[in-house]
């Protein structure tokens, strides 16, 4: 834990659920004391037990080195959808090992049980409906007093709903592309941006030049974000006006729905 997290622990102790994606020691602790007991505790309670960084056993079976799922939340999310994750094919597993952590989630109930809100599907609309019916929100906006959901890091959901996921491209295809050394082909475990190795990632499927592919990413991902400060400033100004004394409550509630 870093210094800022330790300082935060003094003010408001974090749930031990926060350890879930931090170490291969987590599955061991879950097996020893039970999943419910692991979640329903404080972060500091396991500080002397969880000491190793993310490692091989988080994604690989220690005996066979096959890809496997080591975190219960993902298995449970599949089960609630009527799916058996143990029947997943290798190409899908090259994404699912990532989906153990790189997903949207929340801590359910007083026991802080780690839950993926996929019961109705993985689209934004389906997840929003799940939260609405559960009556859950991450916080209430200080100005508008509107309940707010804060997406954690829904990387897997975005990938699966996008064109690459629909075409069967896995997380590893782009972030851990295959390489060959000594006559052996294996996944590069130096996990990084696909743009760092375009010849082994994008250009496996896309025949455009490296410059064109980089520009495509810029146009889709970077350029829209640079316009954010303008609309954000206007939005905050609008919210401030809504909370002025001259705005009637009915008008405020109507506007807050948007």
What positions do the PLM features span?
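Active-site-adjacent structural elements in enzyme catalytic domains
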Residues: 11-14, 23, 49-52
């Amino acid at each position: 834990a870093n210094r800022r997290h330790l300082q935060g622990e003094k003010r408001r102790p974090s749930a031990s659920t926060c350890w879930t994606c931090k170490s291969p020691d987590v599955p061991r602790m879950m097996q020893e004391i039970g999943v419910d007991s692991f979640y329903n505790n404080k972060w500091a309670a396991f500080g002397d037990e969880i000491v190793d960084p993310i490692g091989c056993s988080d994604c690989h079976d220690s005996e066979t080195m096959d890809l496997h799922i080591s975190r219960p939340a993902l298995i449970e999310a599949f089960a609630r959808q009527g799916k058996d994750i143990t029947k997943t094919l290798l190409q899908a597993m090259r994404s699912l090992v990532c989906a153990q952590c790189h997903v949207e989630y929340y801590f359910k109930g007083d026991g802080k049980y780690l839950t993926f809100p996929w019961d109705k599907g993985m689209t934004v609309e389906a997840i929003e409906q799940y939260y609405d019916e559960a009556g859950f929100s991450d916080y209430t906006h200080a100005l508008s007093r509107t309940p707010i959901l804060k997406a954690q890091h829904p990387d897997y959901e975005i990938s699966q709903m996008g064109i690459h996921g629909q075409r069967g491209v896995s997380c590893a295809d782009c972030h851990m592309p295959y390489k060959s050394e000594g006559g052996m082909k294996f996944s590069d475990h130096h996990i990084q941006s696909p743009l760092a190795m375009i010849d082994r990632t994008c250009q496996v499927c896309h025949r455009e030049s490296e410059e064109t592919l980089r520009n495509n990413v810029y146009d889709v991902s970077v350029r829209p974000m640079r316009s954010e400060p303008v609309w954000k400033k206007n939005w905050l100004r609008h919210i401030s006006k809504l909370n002025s004394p001259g705005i009637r409550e009915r008008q405020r509630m109507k506007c807050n729905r948007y």
